[in-house]
Amino acid sequence: MLTKVMVTGITGYIGQHCGAELLRQGYEVIGTVRSMEKADIVREGIARVAPIDNLTFCETNLLSDEGWKEAMDGCAYVLHVASPFIIANPADENEMISPAVDGTLRVLSAAKANGVNRVVLTSSLIAIIAGKLSGHYGTDSWSDPDANIGTYAKSKTLAEQAAWEFAEANDINLVVINPGGVMGPTLTGRVEGESLTMISDIINGKYP
C-alpha cells in the first residue's frame, strides 16, 4: 500500500510542484481544491512531469470545517500549502487573514483527529523579515503583525504563530518552511496567481 499524502492548495504554483514531486517519488497524493472544476487543469499539468495514477482530488474550503477530516482519512503526511496570496492590500484584511489563520488551524485539527505523522506548513520569509532592513534571524524571529507590514505579511505571521501554538498544545509533529521568492516553470502552461503574474509583468516591462 502506498503512503498517502494530502497537499492543500494543489491548484497553486507551489502546490502543483509539491504534488508532482511526491508522485514521482511513489506516494499517493490527494490534493485539495476549492472547486472540482480546477482538478482537470491541475491533473493535466502534473501529468506532463509525473505519473498521475495515484492522484486524486477533494473539494474543501479553508473557511469551512466541512470535509477536512474525511478527506484526510488515511493520510500519513500533510503538506499545507494553501493560503491566499494577494500583493495589494484588500479593503478588508480579514479576507486574507481569516483563510490563512483559520484555515491552518482547520488543517491541523483534522491532522490531529486522523493521527497524521507530520504536517509541513509552507509559511514565508515575510513572516520573519517584514519591516526589517538587516539582521540575523532564527527560530524566534518574527515579523511584527502590529506594525505596518502589509496584510499578506501579517497573515503569514499570524498563521505560522497560530500553527506553532496549536502544534505544541496538541503534540503535532510540525515542520515549517519559509521560502522567499519561488520561481520556475508553470506546469499548466498558464500564467496564474500573483507570483507568476508578477514575473510576467516584469518580463513585459510593466515595472520600471
Regions found by a protein language model. Give the residues of each.
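Conserved Rossmann-fold NAD(P)-dependent oxidoreductase catalytic core, especially the SDR/UDP-sugar
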Residues: H80, P84, N89-Y152
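N-terminal Rossmann NAD(P)H-binding glycine-rich loop of SDR-like oxidoreductase domains
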Residues: T3-Y27, T32
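NAD(P)-dependent short-chain dehydrogenase/reductase
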Residues: N170-P208
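Conserved SDR Rossmann-fold cofactor-binding beta-strand/turn motif
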Residues: V33, S123-S124, N178-P179, M183
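Active-site Tyr-X1-5-Lys
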Residues: A147-L174
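NAD(P)H-binding glycine-rich loop region in Rossmannoid oxidoreductase-like domains
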Residues: M36-I41, A47-D102
